[in-house]
From Swiss-Prot:
The keyword Iron does not apply. Its main location: nucleus. It comes from Yarrowia lipolytica (strain CLIB 122 / E 150). Coiled coil: none annotated. This is Mating-type protein ALPHA2. Mating type proteins are sequence specific DNA-binding proteins that act as master switches in yeast differentiation by controlling gene expression in a cell type-specific fashion. Transcriptional corepressor that acts in conjunction with A1 to repress transcription of haploid-specific genes. Belongs to the TALE/M-ATYP homeobox family.
Amino acid sequence: MKETRDLLFYNENSIDFNFSPEEMDTHQMMCVNNDSQQDTSFLTATTCIFDFQKDIYDDQNLMSFDPFFPQQRDMALWIASVGNGAIDWSTKPQLTLSKKIPDVVNEKGEEITPADLQRHYADKHVAKLPDHSCDLYYLLFKHAKFEATTLRIPLSLLNDNGTGALGPFDEIRSLTDEEQRLLTLLKTISHYSWVTKHATKDCTGQLLDLCKEGLQLVESIQVNKTFNGVILHILVAYFGRRSTALRDEFQLHKLFLEQRLDIELEILAQHGGADAIDSEKLRKVKKLSELWEWFNAIPYNHHPSVSQIEFIASQIGEKVSFVKSWVANKRRTGAKKRSKKPAPSTQIRPALKVFLEKKPFVSRQVV
């Protein structure tokens, strides 16, 4: 379990929040159309909205304190398009990190600066979470030391004394059943994506199925013209992109795991002898049925807790190591048998020898 914890939670000191101007440019969100009338381009404009905004802006730059917000110059238009009575950013479009934000206070009633917001966000959400390449994981999963189970945002710091509104985040409180289902789907997809990338086991089938389901739900809501709020706009852009962009990557990863499993089974057959192939165990390994059951047991209306994620990850580790430990055990028992009867051939093809010499899991480079 300790290895699982190390895998799930990186040391916060290893995350560097300082970026060059070039790197910052790559994380800028797409701008909302400046036309006063809302049009369908708004949907495509959110395509990059999940590119996690971990940049630390200086006072010369406009500040976007949360990944859900576009750049400050588009704030008024964006919020107006949502139409939820949010803070009127049109009167203060050029806020800097050091200037206090009027009417936006913390729990003590003190006006705060954008720098305070960023510091709060980084302390509570970024430094304590896994690999910073997983933008959705930051946004959509709670942490053991930060108990709220909705989107990871500092709601207490976004209170408007004048209206009592929380800006676009009021949308979260009034989601329809379909919208809540989509949001939960997104959480689950984020988890599967992170596990596939970092916890050494493939979730290709689940990811593709969830993406398809999410896209179908979005299309259904659009047809019925019942979609409301910025959350659904984000989901439209996300599912439309994710369902196609991940397919090739996950199919390749799935193919790699299937090939690896075939190789391990071949090694087992070579070194354990025919009597080592127990049909019941072979079925469990071949189908990895127990692994899928662990994931499918997560109900869609429940947000996985950290302890659940750790538990599932530990189960994944056990399933992955099952074949290797089984092979090792059969090798030991096979060595005893060889003293009594002729030993089977111990020659290994070069490809298998190379495979055995590799580390258990091949790290995947994050693009």
